[in-house]
A protein has these predicted regions:
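Short, Lys/Arg-rich flexible segments
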Residues: 1-88, 99, 103-145
Length: 145
């Protein structure tokens, strides 16, 4: 059995097991991963809501229209074949160019705010660290070791 995390995507694979074992283990892994993905998306929205603005002094969040925060979602685990499932959390829907600038830092250009440096938010990195730790702990709780 293996669970891999890469770029906001969780991949679960079970090899060399009987069909019954695969089904039972995959059901448990699917449930654990779906919980982690859902919690991870909520964490991402919280990070946006609690990371001070890079543009407005004294503003305690990065919410203007709410679109960037609302775009943080999760895709539940989907079966790719009998022994493999994939799911994701983060900006899984429409991604605007400014999301990347908020995430990684860089120059903001626009008529409303003018050109200003945006400090990075690092939401995706923070999400990954939290979700990875949560996933490992929940799998240890379910399967041991």
């Amino acid at each position: 059995m293996g669970v891999r995390w890469s770029n906001g995507t969780i991949t679960a694979v079970i090899n060399d097991a009987s069909r019954g074992t695969i089904y039972s283990s995959m059901q448990t892994i699917r449930s654990v991963c779906n919980d982690v993905l859902e919690d991870g998306a909520e964490t991402g929205r919280d990070i946006i809501g609690n990371t001070p603005s890079a543009l407005v002094p004294g503003k305690t969040d990065r919410i203007d229209t709410g679109h960037m925060q609302a775009s943080v979602r999760h895709d539940r685990m989907k079966r790719e074949n009998p022994s493999k499932m994939v799911g994701a959390a983060g900006w899984t829907g429409t991604v605007e160019d400014y999301f990347k600038v908020q995430e990684e830092g860089g120059m903001s250009s626009g008529l409303r705010m003018g050109d200003r440096y945006i400090t990075p938010m690092h939401m995706l990195v923070q999400m990954r660290l939290i979700m990875e730790s949560d996933l490992h702990q929940r799998l240890r709780d379910e399967f041991g070791n």
